[in-house]
Amino acid sequence: MANSSPVYDWFQERLEIQDIADDVTSKYVPPHVNIFYCLGGITLVCFLIQFATGFAMTFYYKPTVTEAYSSVSYLMTDVSFGWLIRSVHRWSASMMVLMLILHVFRVYLTGGFKRPRELTWITGVVMAVITVAFGVTGYSLPWDQVGYWAVKIVSGVPAAIPVIGDFMVELLRGGESVGQSTLTRFYSLHTFVMPWLLAVFMLMHFLMIRKQGISGPL
């Protein structure tokens, strides 16, 4: 590369970054691709916004049944731009779910789930389930009346499953009733387990798309 900087040359010598850049920028895009094929990318952007704003809120949120609600109130009223951070988190969560639904419809209607892209579709379905679980666990974290009763209802649903139902309810709640253990588990799921799971499946999803390319028109 003519007139390259010493820094660029240093990285190029060790990592061959120009080959990587050429591969990324020269990928063929089929002529039938339109704006509706951007819905998956928009969903990713929403997730990144969720990650950034959620990380910011962890500095102030206290995952205890006695302090959760007051810590959220403090974030909204006393922390500089705290109301904006939480509002963006909520808005982007709603937008992420909407974009995900539209993305699934687009893929289904254009046949993007067919051979040889079955695994890409399966990873997408798994990510959709994780996204719904994100919503359920996040909804409970303020630990207000709405959050408490939502947790009580949702965590009680597995009780209808034969044999293992009661065990699953106790596993979700951390005991026989909804309380501190429940909030701790939902907080851990929402801020650690699910983000990592979603990131892993996203990586698999993108690598398969990268390998197989965008599906053709109907």
From Swiss-Prot:
Binds 2 heme b groups non-covalently with two histidine residues as axial ligands. GO terms for cellular component: plasma membrane-derived thylakoid membrane. It is a multi-pass membrane protein. GO terms for molecular function: electron transporter, transferring electrons within cytochrome b6/f complex of photosystem II activity; metal ion binding; oxidoreductase activity. Its cofactor is heme b; heme c. Heme b 1 binds at H103, H205. Heme b 2 binds at H89, H190. It holds the Pfam family Cytochrome_B. GO terms for biological process: photosynthesis; respiratory electron transport chain. The chain crosses the membrane at residues 35-55, 93-113, 119-139, 189-209. It is found in: Cellular thylakoid membrane. Keywords: Electron transport, Heme, Iron, Membrane, Metal-binding, Photosynthesis, Thylakoid, Transmembrane, Transmembrane helix, Transport. Heme c binds at C38. Heme 1 (or BH or b566) is high-potential and absorbs at about 566 nm, and heme 2 (or BL or b562) is low-potential and absorbs at about 562 nm. Belongs to the cytochrome b family. PetB subfamily. The 4 large subunits of the cytochrome b6-f complex are cytochrome b6, subunit IV (17 kDa polypeptide, PetD), cytochrome f and the Rieske protein, while the 4 small subunits are PetG, PetL, PetM and PetN. The complex functions as a dimer. Component of the cytochrome b6-f complex, which mediates electron transfer between photosystem II (PSII) and photosystem I (PSI), cyclic electron flow around PSI, and state transitions. This is Cytochrome b6. It comes from Prochlorococcus marinus (strain NATL2A).
